[in-house]
């Protein structure tokens, strides 16, 4: 973690199943804060980022190759609730790739 990138963890997103998939597991007494997110879809799909079952943001990919970057590095873009996992939800079985940078504190 540094002044230009407060995130202390990152992971590759590689999801193709419709429905919820856990990105970051819940941690007892801690919150997940997302500092950067990049997504790319192989086809038309609606992607939701969720704090447990609560939708934080919805991205509508009308076609393959579109990509919404969220590159906010000094303040968290999303702050989850305590003891809650960060999930991704796909409206259909379409390959979605990307990267997420986050902290758990």
Name what the model sees in each region.
Residues 1-105:
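Beta-strand-centric surfaces of beta-sandwich/beta-rich domains
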């Amino acid at each position: 973690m540094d002044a230009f990138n407060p995130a202390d963890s990152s992971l590759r997103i590689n999801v193709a199943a419709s429905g919820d998939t856990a990105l970051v597991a819940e941690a007892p007494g801690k919150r997940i804060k997302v500092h950067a997110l990049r997504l790319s879809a192989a086809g038309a799909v609606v992607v939701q980022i969720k704090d447990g079952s609560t939708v934080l943001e919805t991205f509508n990919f009308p076609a393959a190759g579109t990509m919404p970057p969220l590159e906010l590095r000094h303040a968290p873009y999303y702050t989850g609730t305590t003891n809650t996992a960060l999930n991704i939800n796909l409206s259909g079985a379409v390959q979605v790739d990307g990267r997420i940078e986050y902290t758990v504190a």
